[in-house]
Amino acid sequence: SVIVGETFVSDTDFAAGQRATGAIAGVDENLLRERRQLDAVTRESLWAALAGLATGKRISAVGNAVETVVTENALINGWEAGIIEEFVGHGIGTKMHMPPDVLNYNVRGIQARLKPGMVLAVEPMLTRGDIASQTDDDEWTVRTVDGRDAAHWEHSIAITEDGVSVLTARDGGVA
């Protein structure tokens, strides 16, 4: 789903509007371009993070990949996305949210070593403005404090002997 200002738009309505018009009625073309760029950078950072995990040795491969994509796209787009630090990916096991944390940014120190059998949710969250966020009273909806756009892409993966299997992609992440 998408929240535009105070308007909630379902995934179906958003997709239908995009297919029918190629644009969202009432949205400035520059703003629409920036939103598409933010979405593309976030999606690209997800796939770069997954590729990093496939060849990396530690969970820090995610933060390295996300930061690299953000920096490279800043040069292309003329603006740099902010990496939301308050929400991160996580391990999945007997509960949905478990250690280890899967950070979308670099930190000093050694992070967990990747081991076959680990299942992780990798979920970069980027913003067009400040990275500060707030959670609504429903305890689910999160917004940026400055009201700027944010984007979130996510996949769950299993670390295998041969790399990764993208559990939430129909093709396992092969494409």
Language-model-detected regions and their locations in the chain:
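Active-site neighborhoods and metal-handling regions in enzymes and metal-associated proteins
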Residues: 1-18, 22-175
